Amino acid sequence: MDDPECDSTWEDESEEDGEDGQADDTTDEDTGDDDGDAEEARPSLFQSRMTRYRNWRAMQDMQRYRHNYPDLTDQDCNGDMCNLSFYKNEICFQPNGFLIEDILQNWKDNYDLLEENHSYIQWLFPLREPGVNWHAKPLTLKEVEAFKSSKEVRERLVRAYELMLGFYGIQLEDRNTGAVCRAQNFQPRFHNLNSHSHNNLRITRILKSLGELGLEHYQAPLVRFFLEETLVQHKLPSVRQSALDYFLFAVRCRHQRRELVHFAWEHFKPRREFVWGPRDKLRRFRPQTISRPLMGLGQADKDEGPGDPSQEAGTQGRTCGSGRDLSGDSGTAEDLSLLSAKPQDVGTLDGDQRHEAKSPSPKESKKRKLEGNRQEQVPGEPDPQGVSEVEKIALNLEGCALSPTSQEPREAEQPCLVARVANEVRKRRKVEEGAEGDGVASNTQVQASALSPTPSECPESQKDGNGPEDPKSQVGPEDPKSQVGPEDPKSQVGPEDPKSQVGPEDPKGQVEPEDPKGQVGPEDPKGQVGPEDPKGQVGPEDPKSQVGPEDPKSQVEPEDPKSQVEPEDPKSQVEPEDPKSQVGPEDPQSQVGPEQAASKSLGEDPDSDTTGTSMSESEELARIEASVEPPKP
């Protein structure tokens, strides 16, 4: 049995002579401090008496509590458990009280009522010893067991603890560990705590009740908080003495109590006046893992030093873990952004290509290609290709598909284009010969199909809109401006077809009515596609795109009687009044739109023989004319 007059905190570490901590403290001379206290002058007799002073009444009271009131026996209360009934919300506290739920819900922010009413605290935090309120019954051992076994009662006890912490400007951060910290309104609440010293008695009661009702782990964090605020932060000077005399020794766990006493000894100034523990044992004592958790979250000790290595490692691990998580997200976010940016870039490229394919002017697309090639060159290096070569490449590329879907090499597309042209011509011949009963119309359609541009996706043919404006989209012995889009087979110029005239908007596309023979011979400068005619060339730099006068097949011989237009034939005359003989902007079929598939001329294919094709078609037309020519009037 411990001596009730002594402090049992250090009793198991007493020396062989049996002296306890208090005796060591009494006989200790202030010459062995390692922290600079030895350099101070020895205190006088009066100072020694003051430094050796300790509140013995407080020490005895707290030791009696820690030893579960050995001199106290439960009174026979006839089976009544008033404290348990109050916490079950069955009765009101006395005198003139309320139910516990009313207090927990309505008194939370009513600080004046919590300060002025002195009857509720004995009911909220009952003890085994009687208090000043004789209406409040002392706590019995049966009630203690009932408090610990009832979840409802335990929950209300924690809420009552949070209510009083808020009244003192403190916040419970973790219900599991009991860690506490300053509340947002701690300054006015600390001021009230300094002004009303009776709250020190309330805090002592709260600490004792927590130890009685199964919440012992809530004691040490709260005591550590008050030691921090009084000895380190110096915010609660009125609470300092009570914290050292009562709060420290309300902790029932001996090891935690030693940790707290050592913490108080380290921060007490002057240290030689510290009387709440034996100095020699405090010098030898080494804090363990309890120091850092006692403060609660966010209440790091500025003067303590390293503190708890395990908790620091845990905190660092959490920080590193969060840092790794953040870096992984950012990396994932970057990967996702890159993955999401790739299809956007592809879509942008496709959009640029579609915009370029639909550009109204082919010269602008050439200019953009040329500028793009120049920008790709390193500054200071000579241009490996001349301007003429770049223009040739641009012209050759115009003959190929520039749509977003055709990204294969252009050389592989040339045989496919020729094959598609031949198939298209054969299909048109079959359809037109079967559908049209008129020989003249059939003759005209055959010639139109033979002279129509090859189906291609060239942006030039899609951009020109009308034949006469683009001299490079047609190649043939006839006037390139005399052709209209492939959708209107009747708009072609034929020797026997009176509908082959170009409207008055194109003066060069008309057959002069003054020419009775209607022949297109070498004397007619417009019937030839020579070097003097800049509109008969595909490109000025492409030698394969010209049909020169040296080619005898490029002219229609005047000796061929079938190629002449008889003056007696009324169909060979130019009737300007005939609405069908004009191709104007009013005729929707006379325009070449970007939606026409067959918009490329055979002359743009350097591998195809344009002149030979035109001559063979002329002979075929002559044979068809001889067989189906109607009698002349």
Curated annotation (Swiss-Prot):
Expressed in all tissues examined, including brain, heart, lung, liver, kidney and skeletal muscle. GO terms for molecular function: opioid growth factor receptor activity. Coiled coil: none annotated. Its main location: cytoplasm. The modification N-acetylmethionine is found at residue 1. A motif (Bipartite nuclear localization signal) lies at residues 257-286. One of its GO terms (cellular component) is cytoplasm. Pfam families: OGFr_N. Residues 1-44, 287-390, 404-633 are annotated as: Disordered. Receptor for opioid growth factor (OGF), also known as Met-enkephalin. Seems to be involved in growth regulation. This is Opioid growth factor receptor. It comes from Mus musculus. The gene is Ogfr.
